[in-house]
């Protein structure tokens, strides 16, 4: 918790979630809503929905499933990179193959495997909000 206290001085990190699985989206929403370090602004079930919302309601961090329906993670990151107020993105997915490398190459600021602990996931989001790149 020192990362939050020392570097953000108590300001909440604004965040948006994107996942096509309603169960995952609900579970992740609850995790972020219960953590006072974050302010969950919106959720989206598709890449297009995420893009539309993040353009209307800028946030510091976007957390997306690599396999977000329609555009997918790589294309969504590519589109967002061209936007002046785009959030820093954390991608999460199964840690198989070269997804972490692909996420980094696409321009994501972080990657978290679905097998990581909740606390590690949250700490990655905090670090990314502070400008760090984290690929676990």
Segments (PLM) and residue ranges:
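Short amphipathic alpha-helix used as the core "switch/output" element in two-component signaling
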Residues: 74-85
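Active-site residues of response regulator receiver
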Residues: 64-67
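Acidic catalytic/metal-coordinating carboxylates
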Residues: 46, 72-75
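Acidic, metal-coordinating helix/loop segments flanking the phosphotransfer/catalytic sites
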Residues: 43-61
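Non-catalytic signal-transmission and effector/linker regions of two-component phosphorelay proteins
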Residues: 1-14, 24
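A short, hydrophobic beta-strand element within the central beta-sheet of small alpha/beta folds
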Residues: 86-96
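C-terminal output helix
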Residues: 98, 116-129, 133
